[in-house]
């Protein structure tokens, strides 16, 4: 799973990670060197039980990622092993976020064959997973006001290119 901000993995893919933690490496591409967010991300990984993760910082905001540097680093990760699924933001950036859209476009260019995206599900996630996901989101104390805007009840992954 490759996302644009610490908390995106929990917000948009928390149920997936909580039920399939052994299948994922999580990479966060962050524009800031924010120690609080870094610690929250590490706490999120520990809460979920993810052993493989990377938090990259210093990437310019907006749609203007330093694309050459980012593509180089993404290719390094993608070549580590034979991945069968890459999960990231959807083409619309969930709520229109330019960094989410840009990351989707880059990954769709690099590995369209195995790309999956976050989508809103119509089926509510189970109460057992919902309780865990809510507890997971509490790890991101610095983002509480932002996270309150989103509904944690529905979550779905969708293959990008069928």
Where does each model-flagged region fall?
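Active-site beta-strand->loop->alpha-helix modules in alpha/beta enzyme cores, enriched
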Residues: 1-112
